[in-house]
Amino acid sequence: KGSVPGMQEHEPPSPSAAASLELLPGDPSPVAPPLARRGPYGVGVTTLQITHADQPDPVGGGRYDRSLTLEIWYPSDRHGTTVHRDAFPPSPGTAARPFTFTGRGARDAPPLDGPWPVVLLAHGYPGSRVLMTHLAEPLASRGRLVIAADHPRSTHLDLGPFVDTLAHRPRDLLFLLRWLDAGLPGAPPALAALPDDGHRAVVGFSMGGYGALLAAGARLDPAARLEAVGVPVGWRGPLAPVLRGRHGPELDAARDRIGTIVALAPWGGRDAILLSSLAEVRARTLLLVGDADQISGYGDGVVPIFEHLGGAHRRLVTLRGMGHNIAPDPPPAAAWRSGDAGEYEHYADAVWNPRVANDLVRHFTVAFLEGDVAAAASSPAWPSAWSVPPSLRHALHVRTGQADATSPSLG
């Protein structure tokens, strides 16, 4: 069988392999493109809890408070490491199993004076606020304030019915945007002073990508067959806000703050999103996906999302042979030590080397967020940010779409 640069057939993980692993999430591979590398700043990281009070409960009816635990990365002059806590998700007959891993952020380090542009980072179902540390830390090191939430009832340790994530993921993101505009109530003053006043970027994986698109104006399809994905019959009542695309005046007012979306294997194009409603999305949008994605779908899932985003400047980057796991950190050492295939496969792809995939996700995300600044980056292998080198042309494909002439530009 011929070898493919950046791609590999994985053998089952060896329990002894973890002993030799020294790389941390976000450390670039030797073949990383230029924008995949860390930036000039050190990174601080802190944890904060906020509450979105009195929210509709699509599971039990009534109202409840949604407590969001936030991990916040920011530019600092400190360099250090910190221990993050996560868990492997539960499976039938097996409870979630906690583990720890190390990141290159200095815990509670003093921030560098801002203001800094803001990136919201949204995990999938299930996921966690530290699932994409490989992306959060380098973005902060390049001068961005990165905020990732544990979305209630959607995490490895707090996994609830899918209908709750369908209803609340866009609402959580709109709430975070409103919280930012309110001055980060509950945050330390030094942290509250960091966000700039520009448009926000939302980077979301799977259900995080779904949430970003719906927060920016898309709607749920009333003809969707959500029963096929485990949503109870009678879901249209509990999901009325995402069917209407209306969440109340305060949340809806935050929609215009979204200037850029990076959707990583976004879910819903095949199963849930009203494709015609994507014309309402005005945010610049980058879609990153594998053409072997069996969860979100490719030709019948993410490609239709790209084609219906007529109101937005957009790009579609396809990793050929990649499945759904385009966004997570590499499998943690705890998965190698346990030898549990399910724990390993929650993070890994069957074909792509996870560090090479991480490199490409970071590179294209930075290229899209930084625009002209990133376009100037070059190396012998990458003459420009969007020029795929010959060695990867069989593995990568890039499409570009322009907004309709009547659509406003958000820069």
Where are these regions (language model features)?
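Short substrate-entry loop that stabilizes the transition state in hydrolases
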Residues: 107-116, 121, 125-158, 294-298
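Short beta-strand/loop motif that positions the catalytic acidic residue
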Residues: 281, 287-289
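Short glycine-enriched nucleophile-adjacent loop
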Residues: 178-181, 209-221
